[in-house]
Amino acid sequence: MDWDLKMPVSWDLAELEHNAVPNMAAAASAAEPGIAAVAASRGAPGRPECSVDLKLGGLGEFGAADALKEPAAAAKAPVSSAAAAASVAKVPPSTSTLKRPRGGGGGGGGQCPSCAVDGCKADLSKHRDYHRRHKVCEPHSKTPVVVVSGREMRFCQQCSRFHLLGEFDEAKRSCRKRLDGHNRRRRKPQADSMSSGSFMTSQQGTRFASFTPPRPEPSWPGIIKSEETPYYSHHHHPHPVMTSRQPHFVGSPSSATTAAFSPKEGRRFPFLHEGDQISFGGGGGAAAAATLEISVCQTTVVAPPPPESSSSNKMFSSDGLTTATTTTTTAHHHHHHHQVLDSDCALSLLSSPANSSSVDVSRMVQPSPAAAAGAEHHHHHQIPMAQPLVPNLQQQFGGSSPWFASSPAAAAVAGGGFACPSMDSEQQQQQQLNAVLVPGSNENEMNYHGMFHVGGEGSSDGTSPSLPFSWQ
């Protein structure tokens, strides 16, 4: 079938609608009698019911629906036209308003505000927006005194208001209230900064003390003096006393030593009796057979036992944070055995006096009965412990050596002696004379002479007894 596109298409809607109703009703009745009955009942002219749902063959209701919709459309048309007219009328005012002055621009909408100062007729339209907004001209905003409503006032450039003259600061251009708030914001109260001086205090101390003040040390040079007099008689074997010049920490050997005794000079005991002297020579006698054990220390403490093959004694001590070297000088009958041992641990921390001079302080320690029984044995033993004992030297030697007599000066200067029990009673030496040397900063020695004797209270297996260490 050919379509002629050039022919104008004309549709008669009323005629189509009129012819479609009986045709659809006949088709519906032929197809289904129930649907035709429903359509006939709904399409009755006496019922003005408008159906909005989809129904098959409901073309006959379009006419009634359109008839009902036409009055509503006619009623809406005037309303929409009125709304369009109103919107068109509102557009010009909204587009015409470009910028309005804020905050009391004046009585009328288009009237420019004037200056609030009495008698000022300045046109603020030529001024900045700031002046128009606050109703003040630029000259009067900086004038110290103006009259506003019959009162002398001044314009505050900080809060942008007129204030009385009493509210203003003389040197500033702002009122005191504004200045106080400004200063409070800028000068906030800050916490007091803790200076280092509050922590690093002197010995008097303050609230804060970061470290304790040092202990007062005795002034040894003020108590004891030394004299360079040939008071020792040195014969053929010099006895070197080794002291440490520099601090030796735990496990470090002694690097530099100096000899305190030499055949050319001697030291004197000014606090002993005149004529009392000690001979370090090789001459015979009970005093010469005593073992001399000179240790560079201030306190003797517990030390681990050495092997059985060792023939020396160790004494461990500390000078501040240093470990001093130990010199053991053993004088047998007609023979002197010298041996220097470096201490390898420090069990106590004590500080020695600075600038200590070379002084000899006599100390007396009473030996145990086991020492006399094993005097003929020449084996050295470990000194495991130290206990203070202050006996009389006359009981030790039976008056054989007048030098060992106790004097009040020696008892006042020297502390308590130390009697050290040994490990084996059968292998004990003769009485030992120990000189405790305290190294000073001037390379001199302080000699505390006393009898340190190794007792026989130890066990035979070489272990040292565990005794408490006490100070007196």
From Swiss-Prot:
Signal peptide: none annotated. One of its GO terms (cellular component) is nucleus. The keyword Cytoplasm does not apply. Residues 252-261 have a biased composition (Low complexity). Residues 192-209 have a biased composition (Polar residues). Pfam families: SBP (PF03110). Zn(2+) 2 binds at residues 156, 159, 163, 175. It comes from the Eukaryota. Zn(2+) 1 binds at residues 115, 120, 137, 140. A motif (Bipartite nuclear localization signal) lies at residues 172-188. A zinc finger (SBP-type) spans 112-189. This is Squamosa promoter-binding-like protein 18.
